[in-house]
Each structure stands twice: as structure tokens, then as C-alpha cells.
Amino acid sequence: MKRAFLYSLMLLAIFVNGVSAQGDKPSPQLKSAIDNLEKTIVTKPGLVPLGSLATLDLQPGSCFVPPESTREFMTALGNKFSGEILGMIIPGSKDEWALDIMIVLESSPSGHILDADANKLDANVILESIRSRTEAANVERKKLNQGELKVLGWDEPPYYDQPKRLLVWSINTVDFDNAASINYNQNMLGRDTLLRMVALGRVDNSKIKQFAKKAATHISYNPGKRYEDYQPGVDKVAEYGLAALIAGVAAKKLGFFALLFALLVKGW
């Protein structure tokens, strides 16, 4: 069943990225990526290191794709990364797993992000900024013969869980073929690093968010990497606050993941 699912994914990837030199087969790069994903996936519950930055307590009902396999898989599907890929969480067990929900974990050396503007987040202003940036990115997508992406509005407006140092938002989008999707973002602030958790899928939105929220509760920064470990005068401070973080990351990640996944999920 797993192999059959992955083969269907390969066929969909042809639609996204075009065919190989043989004309009707997925590229060798994609085949290799899928093989490695299947070979390296972690299905046993327990502690999983996310580099030296954080730790995932993998729960029953969830599987983990290591960073190398995640990077190879996403690169084969046309994605480019600005941060460090830490891995991917998907639902399943050792007997059966699927890619109907994907949580991509990525870290970025942002510097220490001050949260002083947490109570001043203006969802309307931020949304207009995201739309403006997305429209500008659409111009570049046209040049690359890629479909445009339209931002409909908030699925969940931004909110900040101060005790957890967790910044969350979710955006409703529509791709060029009118395929609707959400882009559910959870951003965990650390000492000088941002840990991003971007969840997408083909199932009901509430199931995507439920799975993503549960996964986030089992990820924690390692000692020395936590927000409260910040040392003034020693650690770099980010040049932006929470509002600018949302607008910048959201616009970039919409083009980074959402358009691709909106295409991939058709027919799953």
C-alpha cells in the first residue's frame, strides 16, 4: 500500500514538474528520493533529535522523515530552502503511513526575536502586506511559467502563546486551478533561532490543524537553545518583531509550499 501510494505521488509530481527525458516517467531524482524516504522513515515512538537545536518526542500515530530524506524529497519536487531542514512529521505507524498530512520542520538563524508587539498584532494590516508580497511573487512565478497563488484571507488570524513562545497563523489560499488549501504555520521562538512548523494536506482542515497542534506540543528546544536562555549583549537581536515576521515568512512560505501541495493533493 505504501509503495502504491508513493507511485501515485510520483505520477502527480510529473504533472507539477514535467516529465523526464524518457517522456512519460518521473525523474531518477524523484525515484531516488521516494526510495530513500521509504527506507529511512522512523516509525518507532520515542525521542528524535532535531539536529542540536530541539527534540521531538515522536508519538504513536506519527512517523518522522529524517532531514536528509525530507530535503531530497522536497528538492526533487522543485522546492528550494532558505533555512535548515530538520525533518518532516506525517501520520501513520510501522504498518501503514501516508502523506495526506505533512508537517515540514525548518529552522532559521533569525536572531533573538523580541515579542514586545505581541499585543499589537493588526491582522488586517498584516494580511494586506502578505497579499501585496504574494502578488509581487506571482509576477516572478509567471516568468517561471508557474501558476499564481491567491490569498483569500485568514483561516486563523495570528495569535501568540506567550508562555510557549509560539506564534501561530493559518491562511486560506487558492491556486491557479482553483484548488483551495490552508497553510498552517506554527513558529516556536528560541534563543537565537526560529523553528518553523508548516502543515499542509488533503484532508479536512480541522484534521490538519489537530495533527499539527498535537505534534507541536511534543517538540521542545534543547537546554541552552530556549527563548529564556537569551543572553543580552552576547546574542544577536533580530531586526524585526512578530508582525514583520508573520508578513515576511507567510508570503515566502505560501509560494514555497502551498502552491506545490495544492497541485500534489489532487487525486490522492
Predicted regions and their residues:
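Positively charged n-region of N-terminal signal peptides that target proteins for export
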Residues: 1-4
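Bacterial N-terminal signal peptides
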Residues: 7-16
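N-terminal targeting sequences that direct proteins away from the cytosol to non-cytosolic compartments
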Residues: 20-268
